[in-house]
């Protein structure tokens, strides 16, 4: 309900190709995240993720994922995403925050502050009923609370690491995450960049991502290997025809025609 209300208030992108691109990348990352959860026996959490994707027409450099897998991408961040892998960096990072329930942590902290230090049970790792209560209370403070509250450096570090794995599993080269965050670092503290105000992007962060890449790359290599195995199986005979028409078949056909004429 909160997601629907927020999205309803914002202008949507009217560029079909832009929306299609974002949704395709979001879907692949969401599928990878769901697959990861199921493989690690986190089926309950996987079922809680009711994925939805929205592209907001706004010049601000921003993106976020609300609890339950509601992904919002601002058009202002797309110029920084020259490749789909760079866009996947953004999406997987935000999805990781949702999977790790970081928003619930910051919501409970903010509610506790707003209520003057009153005791509040943390939503993290607790029942869905408590989680829902926390979210509802937070939205009672204003629809911008979840969007504007900053993550801690620890949460950012976790989202960076988990995000690299998710994008790699989705078939996007995690090495391109470095190029994206370098662009973000060059953005500086401009007023149009909301993402930078909550996502520290500095040399230390980029260095940490580089150090974690060796752990994420095997997931990407596994994806590529699986694609090579699956491609010949699906098209079977058509696949052979396509390979033949690339180089060898054309030459063979010409040589046959010449031989028959002679």
What are these regions (language model features)?
Residues 1-262:
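A Zn2+-metalloprotease active-site environment signal
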